[in-house]
Amino acid sequence: MYSSSNSFLGGVNNARPGQPPFMQQPPYSQLPQGQQQIPQQTGFQPQPTGYGSQSASHLQPQPTGFPTGQLQPQFTGFPGAAPPQQQQQFGGYQAPAQQPQLTGYPPQSQPPSLQVPSTTGLPTRLAPRTSSEIANSFSDGAGVAPPPPPKSSGSKIPNIRLSFITAQDQAKFEQLFKSAVGDSQTMDGEKAKELLLRSRLPGSELSKIWVLSDTTKSGQLFFPEFALAMYLCNLRITGRELPSTLPDKIKNEVSGMVDIISFGVPDTEPQGAARTNVPSFDAPLLENKSAPPAPQHPKPQQPSNAQFLSQLAAQPTGFGPQATGLQPNQPSLLGANATLAPQTTGFPGQSQQQYLHSQPTGLMTNPQATGYNGPRPPLPPMPTGFGSNLSSMQTGGLAAQPTGIPGQWGFVNAPSSGLPNIEALKQQLMPQPGREGGFTTAGLSGNASIPWAITKEEKKIYDDLFRAWDGLHKGFIGGDTAIEIMGQSGLDRKDLERIWTLADPSNRGRLNMDEFAVAMHLIYRKLNGYPVPNRLPPELIPPSTRNLNDSIGAVKSLLSQDAESRKASGAFLQPQKTGVSYLKEHSFRGGARSPGFGRKDATLFKNNDEAAAGYRSSARRRVGNDARPSSPPTSQASEEELSVEQLKKKIRETQIMLDAVDFKDENRAEEDEVLDRRDRLEAESLMDRTRRVQDDIDTHPNAVFRKLDNGAERRSLRRQLQAFEDQVPQIASEVRRIEREIADAKLELFRLKDAKAHPNSAANIVGTGPGGTVTEADRIKARARARMQARAAELAGRPVPASVDDDGAAVRRLEAESASIRADREKNEAMTRDVEESVREFTRSLEDSLKEEGETSTREHERRRWEDALGVEDVIRDFIYDLQRGSRTAHIRKEEESRASAQEQRLRHEEPSPGVSRLSPAPSAGSAGSLPGSTHEDRVAAARERAQRRIAERMAAAGLKPHTDTSETLLQRQEREKREREERLRRAEEEDAKREQERQRRLAEEQRSTSDTPAKPVGKKPPPAPPSRRGRTDSAGQAEVKKAAEETITAEQAAREQAIREEQQAQEEETNRLEMEAQKREEELLKEKEAQEARLRALEEQVRQGKIRKQEEKRRKEEAERLAKEKEAALAAQRAEIERAKERERQLQLELERLDEESSSDDEGPVNITPEDSTPTQSQLLPTVTPAAPVSAPESEQAGSPEDTSSQAPPVDFKLETESKNPYFKITHQATDTQVVSSPPVPQPSFTSPKADVHSTNPFHRLAKQETSKPAFTGSAPLERKSRARPEADDDWSAAGSEFDSSDDDDDERPGGGSAKQLASILFGTMAPPRPLSAMDDKSPSKSSTPVQDSPVASLPVPESNGSLSAPAAPPPPPPPPPAAVPSYDPSVAPPPPPAPPMAPPAPPPGPPPPPGPLPPPAPPAASGPPTPAGAPDRSALLASIQKGKGLRKVQTNDRSTSSIAGRVLD
């Protein structure tokens, strides 16, 4: 609120008489050289006496202080004026090596200017000084004691909390009020005006604030009134209006606090104690009750000199004031930590003080100037030097020195320049209501000099912040809270992350008090321009962390040293040899010299039985025949202390305690027994439930499939897979070896063939050289042999052999063949590698499939524990085994049932064929072997038997004798297996009976009444007995029987083969028929798809033309709307005139009734009224004519309204998408658009532009647009409804109805004007029986005024008035499937005939086709309806010819069928 500092610098001080502005005061170093005082050579440095001189030209300062024979005066603290020559030498003079130090102020001469000495009434508070200064102050004030000034009671503000401001604001306002009024209780109007003007509010607003704040109407403000004024200023600055009157609550609070302050002010002030120059050592060193607020806020104005002069009386000193040696007219150079008040000097009314200025006095650490009382800027560097010939050095203000160890926390004072903006940072980060509404970081940044270490003031502020945020006193602040606190500082997120990393070195995610102080100090440094360090300096490491780390390091070093010493001394190996504990020397308490060395600690403990007090018998410690040793003194003392009665009493008490303990133990044992019994009952109930669940699982029809995925079979298959995988490399090596052999054989075969084809080739020469090489002699011999063979052939009359080839031809042929063989070998090698890789991949896939999902060691352990009963108690083991036995029994029983049912089914299936019943066990065995519940070995055997049987059948069919196996026959094996199954079933039934008996006994013992006792399982029907064998009567009968059996088998085989062949033929015929039907359907679907694509292309072309028309019609419509609005305005004006005329007529009628005369007044009335009557008569016709235009075509309006909505939706959507940024508005508009456009349209690039997609950032909005614009196969009717709307539908609502006929004529003459009829006939021709063209022609004249050629769907809502379901009102049909997935039509229902061709474009527009009636939900749209095999090609050709402009001839359609889904339009 007080962000401007201009008012502190020049705005207020200009109004003070006798004092120039702050920036225009004469500098302290511009006094002439001749007027500078020269100290007297008396051996002492002149000291300030605190009094002004009577005459500056005659009196000199008194010589006091230290001898200065070899010393020159030096400016320490706030120096006086220096000559101009000294100022010019500031930058170039080098000080000597040894600079004598001098406390005090050098003598200064007084300028001849007149200044009024100012006095202050602020209480004196002394800051720390050196001992020499304190001694000098005693010597200076020893002679004369100034008269005591009156003591002020001070500004006392009651400790009352105001509810309309926060506690922080109230404390800030208290500081501001105290600094402004000093010891007074009220603030006068001028001071309040100065403070309120800093808010930069207009004068009218400040006047209202003053009227509301000055509740006492005294022209002065008490503190509650001042706080109220600040509160009202804040309201107005934040943009809220000022109340006209104060609320009662605020008014009562302010009035009550004002009364308390008024009653607490005494009538007369007591006489205060005399003020001396002796510092007050009892006051706190840093106490400053009159200091202004912290520098981060602009400091209020100090009281003026005139006010202090009016409060303080001048004190005579007995002689003329003396020169103090201080620089006159010294500028205000104090900061916020000035703690000393100036002293009054001299008589203020003396005329001799015309050469004196106001004197700043006090101790030298922080002297305060009295010439200016405004806000003090930070202290700039001061020049110092030696006397008049030495230049001064640039030094800053006296900074507070740390009083503790360097780098220690909390012992560093604030720098001399203070901590700017620290209070603002505190107020910003304090938890307060309304902070979520927004905050500003203005005023937090600065460029102050901040040390690394945390100062006392900072630590206190940060601790207060920590306690304020740690409301639950957890001792730490979590990450979420720290983010909220640190985020209010306005720093970058990366800087805050680095600060958090430095403040939380342990990565705990929370900060304690010291770590929070480190984080806040780093934030404060960053706000003042310091970078965030990469690692914490030693000054910022919290003491707790540093001490903890040191302690941990010390413990680690002790442990490591102890381990090394024990290792070196061998104490690890022979502890009994030393007999001492080395831990004793390294005790945590210290070394051998520590005070507690004699005491034992936790490093070594040994129980001392001797130290036990009480009675102890010595009979156990008698040694041999020695006398009984004396009891220890402790035992004697205990016996002496306790008498027999006391011992008996203790025994009784102990007995009582033991009995109580026994009773508790008995109770506990009973409770444990009850719990054990309850646990047993629960365990037994759980076991029963488990048995019942297991029985349900075993008896479930799908329980047989549960055995397919057991662990044993998986492991067996994995072992087989591993064995096969091990065989793969061996097989691959064998393949490669065979490939090599094949290649070598091919090469050798080629050599042989080549030698046979070229017998005289050089390749056939046998080499006799080393290594079988061919030499020149071998070639000569070969040529000689060839010549001899040629001569012999010539003599014998045989053909002469071919000449010998050269060496190159044979070699080339061999190389070519070798390359070909090598290429084939490499190709085969690549194939082998591919096969190996494929086998490996297949093996990996099989291994993954054979692995149990989620198989881990824990899962395997649990599975083996509860399935294999490993590591469980005996009861649980017996229970698991019982469940497994029951499961196996149920599995065997179910397997027998399945086999029996399969056998019965096969017998039932083979009954028609004679003689097959005796072979029924064989197929039953085969089918049973392939059951899922059988084992792997059974399935393998069954597969082998089936393969053998098929081989035998094929051999028998080929006339070959099958191989006779001397081993067990099929019938014998089946008999054996049947006996084994019967035995297993019998054992399973016995186990079931035993288990049921056990269960019944257990139920009887538990005395549980069950309503439905499960009955014993009924015995299963035994499988049919094997075919009985005929007894052998004699050998002849046996031969006949065997022969008859063979003939029967042969006949059965022949019949079976004939049946198989017939079945195969039937299957082939059925397959051919299905293939032909599928091919036919595919052709029909392809034709339908082509026709649909052609229709879609035509529709797209018409949609494009319709868009162009809509753009033009939109412009016409907007113009019509504008004209309609103008007409409506004119009509409104005419209605107003009518009303006024009516009112005038009524008034005139009243006047006529009041008139008593009947002469000329009756005639004059109608004469005046007639024009006014004519006006409403003419204008009243307009409202009746105006609605007549839409009445002429109500059907078109009703029909066009839904289409207008759908057609106009996309342009509005485009506008909204490009302009609106509101996500909620986008979502609402998207939902509305989705409801209006119910069916997906044909992709229309003009409706959704790329620009709209770019500007829309809502992902759901983009997804909805993509789904809306997705080009799916939809019906033609939804496409037409979406893309083509009546452009003149909106014009029907206007008052001007003259555009209907003209627009209709224009539509007829357009190139695509007649396309609507064609499109309507195409769309709805398959949905309803087409009407004859004669009927359409009859209806066309009556409908000529309606623009049907542009809106064929306009008549869709008409059936809605009759109660039938209309297309727009019905929910949108589901999207049709793609053409390839169209279901086959029902052949029993004839397809609808093709639509009647519409008239040519030049012909008059016919009436609209009848719309579809109420459609059932599963009915697809017209375009994706049942295909018409005969009409589809003609319709496609017809549509193509229509597109080319071909004229259509009139045809007569005979409606032979009526579609079940077609509707009818009621006229």
Curated annotation (Swiss-Prot):
Residue ranges, annotated region (Disordered): 1-157, 266-376, 613-643, 822-864, 888-1087, 1101-1467
Composition bias, Acidic residues: 1154-1165
WH2 domain segment(s): 1434-1451
Domain of life: Eukaryota
Biased segments, Low complexity type: 25-48, 77-101, 919-934, 1183-1197
Annotated compartments: Cell membrane; Endosome membrane; Cytoplasm, Cytoskeleton, Actin patch
Location of the EF-hand domain: 201-236, 491-526
Gene Ontology CC, one term: actin cortical patch
Entry coiled-coil feature ranges: 634-758, 965-1162
Comp. bias (Pro residues): 292-301, 1369-1381, 1389-1430
Bilayer topology annotation: Peripheral membrane protein
GO molecular function: actin binding; calcium ion binding
Pfam families for this protein: DUF1720 (PF08226), EH (PF12763), WH2 (PF02205)
Polar residues composition-biased segments: 50-75, 129-139, 305-314, 340-370, 1171-1182
Domain EH: 169-257, 458-547
Compositionally biased residues, Basic and acidic residues: 892-912, 935-953, 973-1009, 1054-1087, 1101-1129, 1136-1153, 1279-1288
Function: Component of the PAN1 actin cytoskeleton-regulatory complex required for the internalization of endosomes during actin-coupled endocytosis. The complex links the site of endocytosis to the cell membrane-associated actin cytoskeleton. Mediates uptake of external molecules and vacuolar degradation of plasma membrane proteins. Plays a role in the proper organization of the cell membrane-associated actin cytoskeleton and promotes its destabilization.
Similarity field: Belongs to the PAN1 family.
Record text on subunit structure and interactions: Component of the PAN1 actin cytoskeleton-regulatory complex.
Protein name in the entry: Actin cytoskeleton-regulatory complex protein pan1
Source organism of the structure: Aspergillus fumigatus (strain ATCC MYA-4609 / CBS 101355 / FGSC A1100 / Af293)
